[in-house]
Swiss-Prot record:
GO cellular component, as recorded: plasma membrane
Single GO MF annotation: ATP binding
EC number: 7.5.2.4
SMART domains for the chain: AAA
Family matches, as PROSITE patterns: ABC_TRANSPORTER_1 (PS00211), ABC_TRANSPORTER_2 (PS50893), TAGH (PS51251)
Binding site for ATP: G57, I58, N59, G60, S61, G62, K63, S64
Gene that encodes it: tagH
Official protein name in the record: Teichoic acids export ATP-binding protein TagH
Length: 264
């Protein structure tokens, strides 16, 4: 089986500034030390054709940062991602302009993907039909609900038939009938040996469709492997975490975050 995505020692840092003065110092003074937050810290993993990888972890762990880097909308500070094929990212409102109508967004997004107008014209009816938006396709996206935006984004991205699909919580909004329709499409992609990264807090969906799990905790890759090996460990952790009081949960998160801040 061929490697479709190779994530090599990926780190994503953000400089933290309390004042504009600190920001100016950092810009003007070489090697000026400042507080830095590690959103991701030395992540490495390989995904193969046909892998459906669930990215799991509590809120703030770095899942969405990693999915954006895999998708190419965010660059790592250190490390690299090698992709063997075209990538599409599905997240709520990802790549959509609120000022444009739904049908204008279809054309705009597909032009950005490199499609010709003739190809876009041929695919647009399929996108509209899958989205189930009806006459709302002619309305500005800023008037859409989060579920409607997710429908449009998902419909565009699955119609262009990518080799690698990144889905970030896009199925967590909207009606369950459409969500199941999307999951059926994901299963089709899985059968076609496409590579899928699936970010979700719905462990039922993760268990149903994923073949592997990447558990992200505090910006680090805590575990990565086959679904049956990793998911039970994450579920046990999550059950223990949910039993904690709000104060204990906050303390746990704070300890994780403390390790992610450094002066450099």
């Amino acid at each position: 089986m061929n490697v479709s995505v190779n994530i090599k020692n990926v780190t994503k840092e953000y400089r933290i500034y309390r004042t504009n003065k600190e920001r100016m110092k950092d810009a003007l003074i070489p090697k000026h030390k400042n507080k830095t937050f590690f959103a991701l810290d030395d992540i490495s993993l390989k995904a193969y054709e046909g892998d459906v990888i669930g990215l799991v972890g509590i809120n703030g762990s770095g899942k969405s940062t990693l999915s954006n880097i895999i998708g190419g909308s965010l660059s790592p500070t250190v490390g690299k991602v090698d992709r063997n094929g075209e990538v599409s990212v599905i997240a709520i409102s990802a790549g959509l302009s609120g000022q444009l109508t739904g049908i204008e967004n279809i054309e705009f997004k597909m032009l950005c993907m490199g499609f010709k107008r003739k190809e876009i014209k041929a695919m647009t009816p399929k996108i509209i039909e899958f989205s189930e938006l009806g006459e709302f396709i002619y309305q500005p996206v800023k008037k859409y609900s989060s579920g409607m935006r997710a429908k449009l984004g998902f419909s565009i991205n699955i119609t262009v038939n990518p080799d690698i699909l990144v889905i970030d919580e896009a199925l967590s909004v909207g009606d369950q009938t459409f969500a199941q329709k999307c999951l059926d499409k994901i299963y089709e992609f899985k059968e076609q040996n496409k590579t899928i990264f699936f970010v979700s807090h719905n462990l039922g969906q993760v268990r149903q469709f994923c073949t592997k799990i990447a558990w992200i905790e505090g910006g680090k890759l805590k575990d990565y492997g086959e679904l049956d090996d990793v998911l039970p460990k994450y579920e046990a952790f999550l059950n223990d975490f949910k039993k904690k009081s709000k104060a204990e949960q906050k303390e746990f998160r704070n300890k994780l975050d403390e390790s992610r801040f450094v002066i450099k």
